[in-house]
């Protein structure tokens, strides 16, 4: 009965924000439909292609699942960071990995754990997302700047998770330079290949390691990611926990945290360089 009460309470907490997300998707579809009609009336070539709605049954299931993942996540601010199993994707040949500890021993394609990339002396910024999530890919240039500016005092890890909007699932219109056409991952090779595709489009500094979540989505579940999320691990604890994406995904908060804790050390490093 206690478990049922908890589940009911969580459901009641989720419902208001779930319906607000449904309203947002309905408004988004209305705007896109209006734009499509205007272009059609003007006989523009831009109307070619399929118009995809966001408010679909599959879309609603994905949104609901994302709130459940957030509600039942293992990660808590100030508590131990979940040591999820991941697969190493990126190589750091030619990169400067000084101070990264055991990270240098992890071979590309090897199965490892998230905290293998953490160092006792330095915070680890962990960025979760996928190529088919526009809010995530649109912030990759800002994430790259964070790596470039703070790699002297912090380590960075990008965790590639399940696709947010696979082309054979809850797809979104591919009308921007940030859009990707990636199908649902059928195996670990598919997920790692998608991560490599992302790296080919958005080059990240060698100081940032890239891994892929396992096919059981253990990192996604433990950190309640769903679409995207960012956190900071320090001494095996969660020092900063970002909000649930896409609306609460905020790299600016990460910048503020790093500046607050390490701005003086960064300045000394730049002067020494």
From Swiss-Prot:
Active site: 133
Lumenal side: 1-9
GO molecular function, one term: ubiquitin protein ligase binding
InterPro entries per UniProt: Iodothyronine_deiodinase, Iodothyronine_deiodinase_AS, Thioredoxin-like_sf
Post-translational events: Ubiquitinated by MARCHF6, leading to its degradation by the proteasome. Deubiquitinated by USP20 and USP33.
Predominant location category: endoplasmic reticulum
Subunit structure: Predominantly monomer. Can form homodimers but homodimerization is not essential for enzyme activity. Interacts with USP20 and USP33. Interacts with MARCHF6.
Name this polypeptide is given: Type II iodothyronine deiodinase
């Amino acid at each position: 009965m206690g478990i049922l009460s908890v589940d009911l309470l969580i459901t009641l907490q989720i419902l208001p924000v779930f319906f607000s997300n449904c309203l947002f998707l309905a408004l988004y579809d209305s705007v896109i439909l209006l734009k499509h009609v205007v272009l059609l009336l003007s006989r523009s070539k831009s109307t070619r292609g399929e118009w995809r709605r966001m408010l679909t049954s599959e879309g609603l299931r994905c949104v609901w699942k994302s709130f459940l993942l957030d509600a039942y996540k293992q990660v808590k601010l100030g508590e131990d960071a979940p040591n999820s199993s991941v697969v190493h994707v990126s190589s750091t040949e030619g990169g400067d990995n000084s101070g990264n500890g055991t990270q240098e021993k992890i071979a590309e394609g090897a199965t490892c754990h998230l905290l293998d990339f953490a160092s006792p002396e330095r915070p680890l910024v962990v960025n979760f997302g996928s190529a088919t999530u526009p809010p995530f890919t649109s912030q990759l240039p800002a994430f790259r700047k964070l790596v470039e500016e703070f790699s002297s005092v912090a380590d960075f890890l990008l965790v590639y998770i399940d696709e947010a909007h696979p082309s054979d699932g809850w797809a979104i219109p591919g009308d921007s330079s940030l859009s990707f056409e990636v199908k649902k991952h059928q195996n670990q090779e598919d997920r790692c290949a998608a991560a490599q595709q992302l790296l080919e489009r958005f080059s990240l500094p060698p100081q940032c390691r890239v891994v892929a979540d396992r096919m059981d989505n253990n990192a996604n579940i433990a950190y309640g990611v769903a679409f995207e999320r960012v956190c900071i691990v320090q001494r095996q604890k969660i020092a900063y926990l970002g909000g649930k994406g896409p609306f609460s995904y905020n790299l600016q908060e990460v910048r503020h945290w790093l500046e607050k804790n390490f701005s003086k050390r960064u300045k000394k490093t730049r002067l020494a360089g």
